[in-house]
Design a protein with these regions (language model features):
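Alpha-helical interface subdomain recognition
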Residues: 1-86, 102-107, 114-119, 132-135, ...
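Short Ser/Thr-interspersed hydrophobic loop/turn segments at strand-loop and sheet-helix junctions
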Residues: 51, 74-79, 171, 187-192, ...
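Short Gly/Pro-enriched turn/cap motifs at secondary-structure boundaries
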Residues: 88, 115, 130-133, 157-160, ...
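Helix-loop "lid/cap" segments that line or gate small-molecule binding pockets
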Residues: 93-102
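Flexible, small-/acidic-enriched active-site or ligand-binding loops
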Residues: 137, 190-221
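Long, acidic (Asp/Glu-rich), low-complexity accessory segments flanking structured domains
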Residues: 213-235
Length: 378
């Protein structure tokens, strides 16, 4: 196998600490979290104490000033252990950068240290009942009234929505201006008129709280506008490459874990007097998956390298997201097949990982949208 060269000894020490933390604080409880539909709120505070949240933020805002590889380590370890209920990456690598890049100094100092410590859990509210991939179709509005914006509308499929203390809301400040009329706002969960709907029951990722959000005459200070009014769509487009890279990183880690589980299972499971791994079809399937995962790993690591250099462009990030998650789902399906009937039993991690993987091709921009982005760049 091709050795990975991106990570320093310091990164690997951090990886060891992340793995130890997750094996102690998350793995024993994840099954219960799947039943209740959300993870224990205390895990966020413990993760903050362990330095696992928003490590990339500058020290002046409570972070470590670390590079993105520390975020990648957390994503990979969460993915390898099948802990899909944990929304750390969305909080650290998707929401926090919006505040860092577009928030005022007052907003940064008010909120970012609380994100680092786990005192506040965050979410981003883009998707609506009638607007998914088409963000220009958002109907939620924000109308300036004196020194406040008044927000009305609804959101759905919001990850971390149930536990969120702070939400970035995508809303139209000028509904007639299309994409140029979109703005981003910070809304605290205890703001009057902001209600959380039911937690949504999903096919997979059952421990990840996913909720509906409702806004009825929600008043927020105009200072809670991120950046400039009407620039929200542009900000979203600038930040999406990192979001899509995080999905690809997690997808490859999940595929690698699934292959290892399947190697172990097929070596132990016997049929017709010999191990399943000794059958030619099994060996060929394992060889094919190992090769494709290796190809995916090299590509995603190169994307990580480009991202560290500030050179990861939108089409390449789209390639990583689409190809990485397609591969993840392909590998998980093959691994379930090699597990036979046991692969369809919820008590086996391969079954849960298979169910969890399917949505990877849908969120963060569907894979069809990814192909459209790639095609436009050709």
């Amino acid at each position: 196998m091709i050795p990975r060269t991106l990570f320093s000894p310091e990164h690997e020490l951090f990886r060891d600490s992340v793995r130890t933390f997750l094996e102690k604080e998350a793995v024993p409880f994840h099954g219960q979290w799947e039943k209740q539909g959300y993870i224990d709120r205390k895990l966020w505070n413990k993760a903050g104490e362990a330095g696992m949240l928003c490590s990339h933020l500058p020290e002046e805002y409570g972070g470590l000033g670390a590079d993105f590889l520390y975020s990648a380590v957390v994503i990979e370890e969460v993915g390898r252990l099948g802990l899909t209920g944990i929304g750390f990456s969305l909080h650290s690598d998707i929401v926090a950068p919006y505040i860092l890049h577009y928030g005022s100094e007052a907003l940064k100092h008010k909120y970012l240290p609380k994100l680092v410590s786990g005192e506040m859990v965050t979410a981003i509210a883009m998707t609506e009942p009638g607007a998914g991939s088409d963000l220009q179709g958002v109907k939620t509005t924000a109308v300036l009234d004196g020194d406040e914006y008044v927000i009305n509308g609804s959101k759905t499929f919001i990850t971390n929505g149930f536990l969120a203390d702070l939400v970035i809301v995508v809303a139209k400040t000028d509904p007639k201006a299309g994409a140029k009329g979109t703005s981003l706002f910070l809304v605290e969960a205890n703001t009057p008129g902001f209600d959380k709907g039911k937690r949504l029951e999903k096919v997979g990722m059952k421990a990840q709280d996913t909720s509906e959000l409702f806004f009825q005459d929600v008043r927020v200070p105009k200072e809670n506008l991120l950046g400039q009014a009407g620039m929200g769509f542009a900000y979203l487009m600038q930040e999406l490459p990192q979001e899509r890279l995080t999905v690809a990183i997690g997808g490859l880690a999940s595929a690698e874990a699934a292959l290892q589980w399947t190697l172990d299972y097929t070596r132990e499971r016997k049929a017709f007097g010999k191990a399943i791994a000794d059958f030619q079809n099994t060996r060929f399937k394992l060889a094919e998956m190992a090769t494709e995962i290796q190809i995916g790993r090299v590509f995603v690591d190169r994307c990580l390298e480009l991202h560290l250099q500030g050179k990861l462009d939108v089409p390449t990030a789209a390639m990583a997201k689409y190809w990485g998650t397609d591969l993840q789902c392909k590998v998980l399906d093959e691994c379930v097949q090699l597990h036979g009937g046991y692969g369809f039993m919820w008590e086996y991690p391969i079954a849960r990982a298979w169910a969890d993987a399917r949505v990877q091709r849908i969120y963060a921009g569907t894979n069809e949208i990814m192909k459209e982005i790639i095609a436009r760049s050709l």
